[in-house]
């Protein structure tokens, strides 16, 4: 198998010269040297030599005039001599490994074997789980209000089986009605004989005519008029009292419901998968929480009580600020609200009943009672002027 490669490519205006060197492990000591011409296109293709089972080491070199451009690539092993021109093919006569065979070739085509194994295991688990669900296709969903239950409706429609789940009680099913409904419509109806009693932990089977069973009451009843019972998923089998009250009912599970259940379970499993990094973070968070909780538990009760007292004191020191109250402006000398108040007068006057009563009793003084000094002086001035 080839382990590494080293390519030296030289370009000039006239042509391209390349040096290819593969340096794998040596499988044998015997080597065969073959001459190689400078023109590879006219001779045997290079792929022929590479695909030969005898080749384990290939050295190809062409020499030419070096010009301006040169590109050198190196791998695990770099050799100093670049002027070697022979084409050497070491071979081993005992072993002849085929390139393209074995596990490596298989993995190159189909991927890692571990991944394939994991995928196959997941597929097997899914198929196994689905087979378990398919086994339950013949099962049912049954409900009852008492001890008498509908245990089974045969898939082929041959019988319907009732069971008394009580361990110490006898149940009377005389004149009870066993019916089957599809979309709310009754398609078949069977009435039990009167005075039929089911013993504790016993079964009663109603057989269809196609079963060719024998009529052996009180455990086996043959319904000759009914060829087969209906066992489809859309059919509900009901056991009713003589007055029509349902006391037990039975519904089979369809394979489509089983498939839907499988899809739901697979989707739930995908959603519930937790990545390893997330689990690690969860575990770290849990560990840190446990450490903090332990440290808190180790603290003495006195510190906790002191902390509570200090916290209460801090709460007591805080005072709630009362927002300022804005009173409406009004004049203290009149009742007109549009007159602004005097700046040196308080906005709120104390209420005094005596003064309030005196103000109400007081009457306003008329203008006639007031002496008019200005008018008197004018009269005197007019009389003096007349005398003169």
UniProtKB/Swiss-Prot annotation:
InterPro entries: Lamin_tail_dom, Lamin_tail_dom_sf, LMNTD1. Residues 136-254 form the LTD domain. GO terms for cellular component: cytoplasm; intermediate filament; nuclear envelope. Residues 365-381 have a biased composition (Basic residues). Keywords: Intermediate filament. It holds the Pfam family LTD. Coiled coil: none annotated. GO terms for biological process: cell population proliferation. Residues 349-388 are annotated as: Disordered. PROSITE patterns: LTD. Belongs to the intermediate filament family. This is Lamin tail domain-containing protein 1. The gene is LMNTD1.
């Amino acid at each position: 198998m080839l382990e590494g490669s080293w390519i030296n490519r030289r370009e000039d205006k006239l042509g391209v010269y390349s040096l290819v060197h593969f340096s794998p492990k040596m499988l044998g000591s015997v080597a065969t040297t073959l001459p190689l011409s400078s023109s590879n296109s006219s001779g045997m293709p290079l792929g022929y030599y590479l695909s030969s089972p005898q080749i384990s080491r290939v050295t190809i070199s062409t020499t030419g005039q070096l010009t301006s451009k040169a590109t050198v690539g190196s791998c695990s092993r770099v050799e100093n001599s670049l002027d070697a021109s022979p084409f050497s093919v070491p071979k081993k006569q005992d072993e002849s490994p085929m390139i393209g065979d074995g596990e490596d070739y298989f993995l190159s085509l189909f991927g890692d074997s571990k991944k394939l194994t994991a995928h196959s295991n997941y597929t097997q688990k899914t198929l196994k789980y689905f087979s378990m669900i398919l086994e339950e296709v013949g099962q049912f969903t049954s409900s009852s209000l008492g001890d008498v239950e509908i245990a089974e409706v045969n898939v082929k429609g041959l019988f319907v089986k009732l069971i008394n789940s009580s361990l110490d009680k006898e149940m009377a099913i005389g004149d009870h009605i066993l019916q089957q409904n599809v979309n709310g419509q009754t398609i078949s109806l069977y009435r039990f004989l009167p005075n039929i009693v089911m013993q504790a932990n016993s079964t009663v089977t109603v057989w269809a005519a196609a079963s060719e069973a024998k009529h052996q009451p009180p455990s086996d009843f043959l319904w000759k008029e009914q060829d087969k019972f209906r066992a489809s998923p859309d059919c509900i089998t009901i056991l009713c009292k003589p007055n029509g009250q349902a006391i037990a009912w039975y519904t089979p599970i369809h394979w489509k419901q089983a498939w839907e259940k499988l899809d739901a379970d697979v989707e739930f499993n995908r959603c519930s998968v937790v990545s390893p990094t997330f689990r690690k973070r969860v575990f770290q968070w849990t560990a840190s929480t446990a450490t903090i909780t332990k440290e808190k538990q180790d603290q003495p009760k006195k510190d906790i009580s002191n902390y509570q007292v200090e916290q209460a004191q801090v709460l007591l020191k805080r005072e709630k600020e009362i927002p300022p109250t804005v009173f409406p402006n009004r004049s203290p000398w009149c009742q007109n609200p549009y007159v602004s108040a005097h700046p040196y007068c308080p906005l709120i006057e104390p209420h005094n009943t005596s003064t309030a009563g005196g103000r109400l009793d007081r009457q306003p003084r008329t203008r006639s009672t007031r002496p008019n000094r200005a008018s008197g002086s004018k009269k005197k001035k007019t009389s003096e002027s007349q005398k003169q």
